[in-house]
Amino acid sequence: IYSYDEKPGIQAIATTGKDLNPTTNCGTIKRDYEYKRLGTVSLLAAIDLLTGEAVPLVRDKHTSDDFIDFLKILNEKYPEGDIIRVILDNHTVHTSKKVKAFLATMPGRFIFIFTPKHGSWLNMIEGFFGKMTRQMLKGIRVSSKQELIDRIYKYLMR
């Protein structure tokens, strides 16, 4: 069973000046508030509720095609004939014509369990995204969008 969701709009932000080293009075790095935006990425991710394993996919957007690519990753992880259950929200992408057409090519392979409307907090991955935001994304500065993508994968694959 997987808990799945998207985290869109993760900003790649670069500093415009050098950070100041900590002083004896203040043990933290000082950083100018000015920054340069390098773009955004969307994280499509699931957590295996039995093992805790994260399955990430980082893209520029989160379209039906991106969701299908994510489902293909899950499909490759299990032998043919196994049923893959996915807990997810009611985002329109999850029930689009493209997704339905993809699912029709492998009947019974995926079972979607939708959270109630306004009940996203019931999906376990929401807590994981909150922890990731606090531990890794808060205050992050990168030199490129690709560096942000690499750091997201490194965080999730540890």
Tell me what each language-model feature is.
Residues 62-63, 86-97, 116-122:
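Acidic, metal-coordinating catalytic cores used for nucleic-acid/nucleotide bond scission
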Residues 52-57, 112, 137-139:
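Short small-residue beta-strand/loop micro-motif enriched in glycine and branched aliphatics
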Residues 29-35, 104-124, 140-142:
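RNase H-like polynucleotidyl transferase catalytic core
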Residues 1, 85-86:
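Hydrophobic "anchor" residues on beta-strands that sit immediately upstream
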Residues 1-65, 72:
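Extended, low-complexity cationic-aromatic segments
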Residues 3-5, 46, 52, 71, ...:
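Mobile genetic element proteins and their domesticated derivatives, centered on retroelements
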Residues 65-84:
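Short, basic/hydrophobic alpha-helical segments
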Residues 125-147, 151-154, 158:
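Active-site proximal helix-loop segment of RNase H-like, two-metal nucleases, encompassing DDE(D)
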